[in-house]
Amino acid sequence: MRIIPAIDLKDGQCVRLFKGDMDQNTVYSDNPGETAKQWAEQGAERMHVVDLNGAFAGEPVNADAIAAIRKAITIPMQLGGGIRTLETLQKLFNLGVDFAILGSVAARDPELVFRACEQFPGRISVGIDARDGKVAVEGWAETTDLNAVDLAKKFEDAGVAEIIFTDIARDGTLTGPNVAATRLMAESATIPVIASGGVSCLADIQALLENSGPYPNGNRISGVITGKAIYDGRLDLAAAIALSRRWEN
């Protein structure tokens, strides 16, 4: 199970939001490249980057910061936030992004996910952000009637690399991940699931590892994203990575 540090970009800075509220943000750094380098040096094998301005604008906004992160690290980078078209995907891949996350558009226009997977095989993940089990879109500002698990199952034959599942009620709260909901997602669909939201300490990583599978359907929880906990010093990234590696072995 990969331990993936998160860099959320707002106005070119690294921030963390509380429950996805753009007005409740803490600025941690004005140097995204240096922040990415720091996490990579602690052993991260992948970087999770979100363009928060992009999520609301409907197109990526923080291109300079994304380029700075790419220049600073050699590990793969996955990026989400405001990706709505195949043209935008191509631009991001040209910038050096390795994997792209389709969020709101996956709920609004599922067919685009299939086309994207066909055009960029192995490089497309779907971000499913849920509030009480229902999919939220447009930077979490709107909750739909779509069931999160049903949306994941819709893409089983698309060639989606991973589902990034976020429980909005936990995000940025340090109250622990929603292990049960993440496990349900992985047990119900056949696409590997990355857990996101609420991680606060090593015990949370342990709980996810203990529930990571593989399940009878062959699927598993393949990773966990951590943000606020590593920025606040509550979780030692290197220790979390070491724990995961010991578990895998």
From Swiss-Prot:
HAMAP family: HisA (MF_01014). The keyword Isomerase applies. It is an enzyme of class 5 (isomerase). The keyword Isomerase applies. Belongs to the HisA/HisF family. It comes from Magnetococcus marinus (strain ATCC BAA-1437 / JCM 17883 / MC-1). Pathway: Amino-acid biosynthesis; L-histidine biosynthesis; L-histidine from 5-phospho-alpha-D-ribose 1-diphosphate: step 4/9. GO terms for cellular component: cytoplasm. This is 1-(5-phosphoribosyl)-5-[(5-phosphoribosylamino)methylideneamino] imidazole-4-carboxamide isomerase. It catalyses: 1-(5-phospho-beta-D-ribosyl)-5-[(5-phospho-beta-D-ribosylamino)methylideneamino]imidazole-4-carboxamide = 5-[(5-phospho-1-deoxy-D-ribulos-1-ylimino)methylamino]-1-(5-phospho-beta-D-ribosyl)imidazole-4-carboxamide. Keywords: Amino-acid biosynthesis, Cytoplasm, Histidine biosynthesis, Isomerase.
